[in-house]
Amino acid sequence: MAVSAGTPISLVNAVYGTLVERAALGRKRLGRPLSLTEKILINHLADPANQEMERGRSYADFRPDRVAMQDATAQMALLQFMTAGLPETLVPSTVHCDHLIMAKTGARIDMGVAIDTNKEVYDFLRSVSAKFGIGFWGPGSGIIHQVVLENYAFPGGMMIGTDSHTPNAGGLGMVAIGVGGADAVDVMTGFPFNVRWPKVIGIKLTGSLSGWSSPKDVILEVARVLTVEGGTGAIVEYFGDGADSISATGKATICNMGAEIGATCSVFSYDQHMAKYLQATGRADIAAAADKVASELRPDDGAQYDQLIEIDLNSLKPLINGPHSPDRAHKVGAGVGDAARENSWPLEVSAALIGSCTNSSYEDITRAASVARQAAARGLRAKTELLISPGSEQIRATIERDGLMADLEAIGATVLANACGPCIGQWERHADVTAKPNSIVNSFNRNFPKRNDGSANTLSFVTSPDTVIAIALGGRLDFDPTVDTITAPDGTEVLLSAPVGEVLPANGYDPGVDTFTQPPADGSKITVAVSPTSDRLQLLEPFTAWDGSDYIDLPVLMKAKGKCTTDHISAAGKWLTYRGHLENISGNLFIGAINAFNGATGEGKDITDGGTRLYPEIAKRYSQAGISWCAIGDQNYGEGSSREHAAMEPRFRGGVVIFARSFARIHETNLKKQGLVPLTFSDPATYDLIGEDDRISVMGLPPVPDKPITCRITKADGSTVDFEAKHTFSPEQVEWFKAGSALNIVRQNLAKK
């Protein structure tokens, strides 16, 4: 499979070549107008003539146009792909090195340290990419989603990526879905991508943004309205005159953070902003092709939505969301100030950060730099640590050429590497800062405890780059740039003017250093070596098939209280080192989970001797003793990133069932992919009935689609309580369970060919 540093026009033309006909087929079959979401999905169905298309119920097989993987998740995905026995991927695929670079000093030094520290992993990813026909974007290329937007995304396309913020490509009208590595392996080996047909949430935007309001405030408001669970099982489709007023990169910001409401993905209709962005990034041919089918790259008149929300951009005010949950919204200034005083959050800001895949475009940086120039002209500097992460090498080179980097450095900013950095916990801070409660503001996406720097003392607030730079200058969490002033060195009071940005660089983009490696035409002679003594990479052994028995008297390894995100289940930060080594990464299993029985973090009771140990130690002991176990989650269990390690680790250590009041979509699928059984309490109150010494039995396995499962709690005194649990297994997914994993099914099917 030939893979280059861009999407070939032949692929785009092939997608557009069937779009009109298949959209017409969809209208005929459904008997109504179509949303844009439905048009794209129907055009990518494996069997558009016969596939059931009932929103929220039907499972469907899709043929995505491409796969993208970031370096932290690519390791496990490609270790799985290597076991399939194919000579190359069957769908265009790329690897992007962005997650393993620690932010500490600045771009040049940090990059050098990362290349040295991660040499074994980078060499593995580079060689496995070359062998199997995968495009390789080396360290320094930039954040996967910005690179995809600049080079691969196109209106009406469909892609999957092994990162939860893959929906960023919706800013160019693409259905882009975050998945676990096993889903990526399915597609790379030529099998369809199977997912439940999503509901469609319509968000009508009217008016236009102005002043200090930005695209980030749109998604912060959507998160407030829908909460972190409100988008689960749905694609969010934005439309209206307000949508057409937002730039392509602004649209991408909104789609990107749709992951924080649990949405499958988000998408905007094709418009002239997208066309101009395509032209500016060297893809005028794709814009011209999209223009020819433009009517099918927008929803039909009368398109139906399962839920409709309207937001007036004219009246939208800047927001700041946090701490600990991205839907905890406050108005900038007095709103967050009142909440801070009520909750004893520090008002002094210890750090301000601009970047991440959500907000690191040229437009984002120009708006922040316009505020910085005002400040520098009056002798002002940031009153806190100010860190900037460019989204890509192209962005870095362009903002350096255009003087924007210098504008930011003039007020005290440090420019970090083109990478994720602090957004995913790759940030080495001074211990004296994190030793006490401290507040940080950033333009990132997630603000879970310990997310950015590993410290439970850090309270993280998410907002726009504009507001971040203003708060950095004001020095306080409750600084409101629309009314508050800053005292200049000469004693005068400075009221900052609203930011002004440039959507696209007037002199075009500077591509910077070429960091892409195209795979050779024939990689068959390339050797991919994994040392048996490596502590970072480990070849995988297939999980064992189900033995045909019900699960009886399972001990409860862990019962989580409140949020239990994938960060709680499988922490990032320093643990990113072991993302390619299943045994070593399993040392972080549940270390962030709050024990519902005693409030402790990361530890519980070991049934073998009654002692208290860290969860990963207990899980290892159970595994060595041949004890299968279950875990209990609360609401939206597995919220957050797409990391499949949060499913592979429990499976590796003997976990067989995960119960929860509700699941996040990606994580629920990842659990099924690895042969576990995710079950939702039919009565959420059942969660409260489960005690530390209870044993739980799951009867009537394997799961039967659309039929609940009967379970039993056995108390220490021998008394029992029966309860019902729901599941979402499709017939195909039942086969994953029976085989031991979805990958085992892939191997079996390939062996038959």
Task: Please annotate each region the language model reported.
Residues 4-7, 71, 154-286, 380, ...:
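Mobile "lid/hinge" segments at catalytic clefts and subdomain interfaces of large enzymes
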Residues 12-14, 19, 23-198, 580-628, ...:
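Long, structured ligand/cofactor-binding scaffold of large enzymes
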Residues 50, 150, 154, 246-255, ...:
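Short glycine/threonine-rich loop-to-helix capping motif typified by GTGT followed
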Residues 50, 54-63, 77, 97, ...:
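Terminal amphipathic helices with adjacent charged low-complexity linkers/tails
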Residues 79-86, 306-399, 403, 522-659:
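Non-catalytic terminal/interface segments that mediate subunit docking, oligomerization
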Residues 377-427, 433, 641, 647, ...:
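Extended C-terminal subregions enriched in glycine
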Residues 486-503, 667-736, 743-746:
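Acidic, glycine-rich flexible loop/linker segments
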